[in-house]
Amino acid sequence: MKNIKEKATLWLSDTFDSETQNEIQQLITENSDDLTDRFYKDLEFGTGGMRGMMGAGTNRINKYTLGKATQGLCNYLKKTYTDQKLKVAIAYDCRHNSDTFSRLVAEVLSANDIHVVLFEDLRPTPELSFAVNELNCHAGIVLTASHNPPEYNGYKVYWTDGGQIVPPQDKSIIDEVNSLDFSDINFNAKPELITEIGAEVDEAFWKASIKNGTFDIEGREDLKIVFTSLHGTSIKLIPEVLKRAGYSQVHSIKEQEIPNGDFPTVKSPNPEEPEALEMAIALAEKIGADIVLGTDPDSDRIGIAVRDSEGKIKLLNGNQAMVVMTDFLMKQWQQQGKLNGKQFVGSTIVSTSMVNDIAASYGVETKIGLTGFKWIAKMIKDFPELDFIGGGEESFGYMVGDFVRDKDAVTSALLACEIAAAAKSNGSSFYETLLKLYTKHSFYKERLVSFTKKGMDGAAQIKKIMIDLRKNPLTHIDGSKVTFVNDYDASTEKNMITGEEKSIHLPKSNVLIYHTEDGTKVAARPSGTEPKIKFYFSVQSQLDTIENAKAKEQELDKKIDRIITEMAI
């Protein structure tokens, strides 16, 4: 506690403004437990940026932690581009203080003689990624904490290609940030270097989205859509892009249209959770809609709900949406005569392996990266000789084409409607399209189970779980022999039958994946953005007919239940 108080006392110096000093002094006087949480560590500027609770302290998002991160970025940009006029794009979401923080970040950049193009109002994250390329920027920054609780905010950094920072830039920027003291931040803004942007970038984005996300289909005017932005940024782009594409029956949830960092109508603004889409699904059932679209606050993730075999609106998981989208895109490329062996799709190590099966059936390669969309964006940069068709991950993110280099709920919403409209016009449905893929390839069933472990104790518990899984590896999972164990921290793939080890040629990451003889996959991974440890379960079995899909799903669900019980997690 003594070291924490000493650390906190430094925040009473003249480096910090009076508001910050008063906030810290009160915590010291009260000897508050909150003081410990605010100062027991520094909020890490990680490989994609920062995310944390707002407030004064080294373990919080505030003027000084954001200022230090930005100053480090400025220093790195100047060392990298010694003879260029630097330009950085900035966007922000609907969260509390996001607009203020974006202005602050712009001021630090301008103080360092860097030209800033700042969105005049909140905008989706994919539009920021697009703007970096469109406006020839050297970097981009978005102020967002995705779907975290209201007390959180965050800071993500993008590089010249519009993708989030990856090696070697990420470590070099982190080193620059860590070398600084708070007193090194230059807050002396140069307003003449800050330019506001908005409508002109929206227009360019809409055109690019329609170019990449629409195809030669029929039935757009007959598709009935319910859309919710969950109080976030997608309200700025999705209704308009659907209208321009020819979708006239779009019903928006009025109560959730207004951007609001408190997210007052939902427990969590996360479209991965069915509860977040309750209002939208209720309206869809009432009006007989075909599809429901819901996005998270910064509009990179999308939840898609469609009518199942019994006519009920059902939220698809990210893997299900991804396989249908991937198959549809490749079918379109095939019909246009564009598949020639020089294309690829992208996915991640914890996402469904069904994507690999589908791509292979079209003669298309699947490239697999670590968890996080930045690795899919990096593939585009690393393989310029190949055309990128699309890519996704299990956490409700998808990207269509390479005009954006991050998951893009806007164009994904458009693509989902194209799939649904085309299916409906042919007497089928989005859901039936999925079931047909299951009969063709195999019924893959996935489930994500997360455990929240907050604070210092929680971090220690998560560490212990991963150590135990490595020291005492599973030999069987639900009676099926473990054949391979992939340890991405050790960069090894071990054959559990022969004992042979191979190298994994991906950056190190604290992920462990078990593979069994019957095609089961179990992955364990601590979250990089939340105090959670995540377990990903994937099981599969052949499906003979669509009519047996419900029974097959129940069978596979029971298998996952058995595995969870067996692992005692």
Which functions belong to the PLM regions below?
Residues 89-152, 248-303:
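N-terminal small/polar loop signature for handling phosphorylated ligands or for N-terminal nucleophile
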Residues 101-109, 152-159, 300-319, 355:
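Short Gly/Thr/Asp-enriched flexible loops that form oxyanion-binding sites at enzyme active sites
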Residues 158-186, 319-342, 347-357:
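Glycine-rich phosphate-binding loop plus the immediately following alpha-helix
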Residues 8-105, 195-222, 233:
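An N-terminal, well-structured beta->alpha segment
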Residues 11, 15, 34-39, 43, ...:
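Gly/Ser/Thr-enriched, mixed-charge loops and adjacent short helices
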Residues 39-59, 145-146, 229-241, 297, ...:
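Conserved phosphate/anionic-ligand binding catalytic regions in large, soluble enzymes, centered on
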Residues 285, 289-291, 312-314, 332-525, ...:
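Phosphate-binding and adjacent anionic-ligand microenvironments
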